[in-house]
Curated annotation (Swiss-Prot):
Membrane topology annotation: Single-pass membrane protein
Species in which this protein is naturally found: Xylella fastidiosa (strain Temecula1 / ATCC 700964)
Subcellular localization: Cell inner membrane
Family: Belongs to the ATPase B chain family.
Protein name, per record: ATP synthase subunit b
Swiss-Prot/TrEMBL keywords: ATP synthesis, Cell inner membrane, Cell membrane, CF(0), Hydrogen ion transport, Ion transport, Membrane, Transmembrane, Transmembrane helix, Transport
Function summary: F(1)F(0) ATP synthase produces ATP from ADP in the presence of a proton or sodium gradient. F-type ATPases consist of two structural domains, F(1) containing the extramembraneous catalytic core and F(0) containing the membrane proton channel, linked together by a central stalk and a peripheral stalk. During catalysis, ATP synthesis in the catalytic domain of F(1) is coupled via a rotary mechanism of the central stalk subunits to proton translocation. Component of the F(0) channel, it forms part of the peripheral stalk, linking F(1) to F(0).
CDD domains per record: ATP-synt_Fo_b
GO MF entries: proton-transporting ATP synthase activity, rotational mechanism; proton-transporting ATPase activity, rotational mechanism
Gene: atpF
NCBIfam families on file: ATP_synt_b (TIGR01144), PRK05759.1-2 (NF004411)
Pfam families: ATP-synt_B (PF00430)
Lineage: Bacteria, Pseudomonadati, Pseudomonadota, Gammaproteobacteria, Lysobacterales
Length: 156
């Protein structure tokens, strides 16, 4: 065999190999590679989208927490204000009740004093009448008069 025939046969075999690879093997390989590239690209896009959504969610969480904190502070302030109002109302009610009780006590004291004065007047008038009776029953002389007045003073 001739060297040219061998080179020609090898060239023909190589061309047949190239044709078989190019028509039968290469297209499915390219298709698999392209599908893999597409999946990788989709995965990267999904990862980017996930990162963006995560950042948005974190921002939204921060806003929500800030609003919740603000609302909590407002509620606490309202509770303090309401407690202050309740305390002030209780103080005012206690002062009013104290004043009312003082007025009632003052009225009772005045009534008791009035009763005591009336009782004292009655007692003094009875003593005066009794003293006058004693004076009128006896003859009036200086010693008797003085003695009766001393008795009345002792009774008073």
């Amino acid at each position: 065999m001739d060297i040219t025939f061998t080179i020609f046969a090898q060239s023909l075999a190589f061309a047949a190999l190239i044709w078989i690879v190019a028509t039968k093997i290469w297209p499915p390989l390219i298709k698999v590679i392209e599908e893999r590239q597409q999946k990788i690209a989709e995965g990267l896009a999904a990862a980017d989208l996930g990162q963006k959504e995560l950042a948005q969610a974190q921002e939204e969480i921060k806003k929500t927490l800030k609003n919740a904190h603000k609302k909590a502070n407002e509620i606490i302030e309202q509770a303090h204000a309401r407690a202050h109002q309740i305390i002030e109302a209780a103080k005012a009610e206690a002062i009013a009740e104290t004043n009312r009780q003082q007025n009632l006590a003052q009225v009772e004291i005045e009534a008791a004093a009035k009763r005591a004065r009336e009782e004292l007047r009655k007692h003094v008038s009875i003593l005066a009448v009794n003293g006058a009776e004693k004076l009128l029953k006896r003859e009036i002389d200086v010693n008797t008069h003085k003695m009766l007045l001393d008795e009345l003073a002792a009774e008073i």
